[in-house]
């Protein structure tokens, strides 16, 4: 009887014993300060956006989120200056009209560390950001590009990480911007009315 009690007491002590620190084996998400957007080979030249028919490409390295693979999401952002202060979404949401956008997203959400875009898309975006019309479009302009990275979670997103900024020299041209055509949805059912 004493032997069983002693054995039970010894086993229960072993169950409650634990390592002093077991964090070394658990992966920990670390948010890096920055990551690298590779300078494209066309960055040293002036890109004529009107005559460029091939797509332009960007590539970057995945941020180091602690040494293990993470399914990060990326968005390519373009700015008319090197500031990246007010986004197009923030300016659109401002009811007073006091905020003017100085950057906008060139891409939708990406999961690869590369992106191909058309010169026309870049031209339309910088024309919209600068508010150019046919009379005041410049022969040459500087455009600044960076990549935003984040990890989507069920509660939203983690901290956002931004890449370095790459300066591109472009020769823009005028494109008449127009509002997008409305999407018509033909819905059927009692809940629609």
Predicted feature locations:
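Insoluble glucan recognition modules
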Residues: 17-77, 83-193
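Sec-dependent bacterial lipoprotein signal peptides
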Residues: 1-18
């Amino acid at each position: 009887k004493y032997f069983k009690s002693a054995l039970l007491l010894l086993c229960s002590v072993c169950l409650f014993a634990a390592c002093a620190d077991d964090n070394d084996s658990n992966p920990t998400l670390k948010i890096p300060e920055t990551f690298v957007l590779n300078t494209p080979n066309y960055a040293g030249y002036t890109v004529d956006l009107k005559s460029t028919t091939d797509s332009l490409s960007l590539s970057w390295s995945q941020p180091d989120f602690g040494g293990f693979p993470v399914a990060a999401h990326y968005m390519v952002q373009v700015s008319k200056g090197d500031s990246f202060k007010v986004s197009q979404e923030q300016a659109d949401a401002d009811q007073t009209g006091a905020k003017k956008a100085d950057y906008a997203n060139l891409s939708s959400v990406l999961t690869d560390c590369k992106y191909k875009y058309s010169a026309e898309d870049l031209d339309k975006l910088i024309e919209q950001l600068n508010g150019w019309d046919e009379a005041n479009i410049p022969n040459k302009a500087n455009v600044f590009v960076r990549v935003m990275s984040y990890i989507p979670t069920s509660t939203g997103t983690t901290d956002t990480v931004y890449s370095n900024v790459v300066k591109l020299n472009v020769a823009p041209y005028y494109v008449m911007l127009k509002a997008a055509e409305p999407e018509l949805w033909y819905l059927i059912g009692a809940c629609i009315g």
